[in-house]
A protein has these predicted regions:
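Sec-dependent signal peptide recognition
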Residues: 2-10
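Alpha-solenoid helical repeat scaffolds
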Residues: 4, 15, 20-440
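C-terminal interaction modules of eukaryotic adaptor/scaffold proteins
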Residues: 444-447, 453-460
Length: 460
């Protein structure tokens, strides 16, 4: 029920879209004239409508509905409901009377009654297309399958009604079936005249379907029609990032963010802007935009990983590590293996950087701890032991203590069981062990490893 009520705001727009009176009656001019007085002089409007309903029109259901719709268009739901009921009293099988009462119910946020009335209109007149559309709109955000079924039912009765394709696209979009939504919109656009809303929705569908180039084309066409469309300007920035057209993306970002006071910016807008800046190597400004994204929504702690990546590119490892710690600390559960591994590797890279040699022991200790966890969590994967070997090799640069030996041996025992093992990794393991035994003057054992290298890579 809660979801059903939440759809009301968007559905009121649908009343405008699908609630137009069918071809006007001979009395339409008089109805329109009287309708102009509804707000300023309701009594006089009522008199005019009463006059219209005299004589042969006393039981004219079409006219009753037309007057009711005039009241509804002015927001007068009580009067509109009264005329809808009068039409039903005259003819209980009047489909358009139920269509009107459904619109009144929707205006009053009574979506259950609205859907019931639309369904009754369809029952009374299976060709009442507006009732199909409105029923589909009511359930689109609550039970989209019901919407889909109703639209497909209408399509069998009115295959040439191009509006159905447009509505199908909306329903598929709601269901997350972006490929089908795209196909439906394409069908609509072949014969329809796209509006600003059409370009906006279609460009969004294409983006979600990862058709970034086509989305960008629709964005450009939409912006020609509506240069200030906020969503289209956003998509221009998003599409260009995905297309790796960073220059165009930054220009689109400048246009999109030209109104700093706009309340419709979301955290992801700043994330995309930051990634464009990062791609353009404007690292300081990229971090500033990532910070804005976090300030807007602190729950998205994954942004700290983006910040860490920027600092890593600048080789500012202390800040990269600090940001990565914030990323790990913001997780609701335990970090996965890949996150642990990347954190360990970040500490290893910091230890190898000449700018941070004073902190090398700290970075190596942290890296060793993390890679030990990786090795324990995935014992059949070589990476944990392999990177522990690299860490301990840095601790023992002359290989006099053989600190890396047990880890290279452990990694090698796993790698040798894998036919697709990377040659360079196998060579590194065997090289270390060959050199270790050479330092120990165990030349026969050393030679075994050098021969293994020649088997792996004869050109070495």
């Amino acid at each position: 029920m809660k979801k059903l009520v939440l759809t009301v705001m968007s559905l009121c727009l649908a009343v405008t879209m699908w609630g137009q009176t069918p071809a006007g009656s001979e009395w339409s001019p008089q109805v329109k004239q009287a309708a102009t007085m509804i707000k300023e002089n309701p009594a006089k409007a009522s008199e005019a409508f009463d006059e219209l309903m005299k004589g042969k029109n006393k039981k004219n259901t079409s006219l009753l509905v037309e007057i009711g719709r005039a009241y509804l268009d002015q927001g007068k739901t009580a009067e509109a409901a009264e005329y809808a009921q009068r039409a039903k009293d005259v003819n209980s099988k009047c489909a358009v009377a139920y269509l009107l009462s459904g619109d009144v119910a929707l205006k009053l946020n009574d979506v259950n009654k609205a859907s019931s009335d639309y369904n009754q209109a369809i029952y009374l007149d299976e060709n009442c297309s507006e009732a199909y559309f409105k029923y589909a709109q009511v359930y689109k955000g609550v039970d989209p399958q019901l919407s889909l079924d109703m639209l497909m039912r209408l399509q069998t009765k009115a295959p040439d009604d191009n509006r159905i394709s447009k509505e199908l696209a909306d329903v598929y979009y709601t269901m997350g079936q972006y490929g089908k939504a795209k196909e439906a919109y394409e069908s609509y656009l072949k014969v329809g005249t796209p509006t600003e809303q059409d370009y906006t929705r279609y460009a969004t569908l294409l983006y979600l379907n990862k058709d970034y180039a086509q989305s960008s084309d629709m964005v450009k066409k939409g912006l020609e029609l509506a240069p200030e469309n906020h969503v289209l300007k956003r998509l221009a920035m998003y599409d260009n990032l995905e297309l790796k057209d960073y220059k165009e993306g930054l220009e689109a970002a400048a246009t999109f963010f030209s109104n700093p006071g706009n309340p419709d910016y979301v955290y992801l807008d700043y994330v995309y802007f930051a990634r464009l800046l990062e791609a353009d190597k404007q690292y300081d400004e990229a971090v500033a935009q990532f910070d804005k994204a976090l300030a807007m929504d602190k729950s998205h702690t994954e942004i700290y990983k983006d910040i860490s990546d920027v600092y890593e590119k600048e080789r500012d490892f202390p800040k990269a590590i600090e940001a990565y710690k914030n990323y790990l600390g913001g997780m609701k559960g335990d970090p996965d293996i890949s996150d642990l591994f990347l954190y360990g590797r970040l500490n290893y890279y910091a230890a190898t950087d000449s700018a941070y040699q004073d902190k090398q022991p700290l970075y190596l200790a942290e890296a060793d701890t993390i890679f030990a966890q990786v090795a324990a969590k995935v014992p059949d994967n070589y990476l944990g032991n392999f990177w522990r070997a690299r860490v301990n090799s840095l601790r023992d640069p002359e290989t006099t203590q053989g600190l890396a030996k047990p880890y290279y041996e452990a990694a090698l025992s796993i790698l040798e069981q894998k036919p697709d093992a990377t040659k360079s990794v196998l060579v590194e393991c065997n090289s270390y062990l060959g050199y270790y035994y050479f330092v120990k003057e165990d030349y026969n054992q050393s030679k075994l490893y050098w021969n293994k290298i020649l088997e792996i890579d004869p050109g070495n």
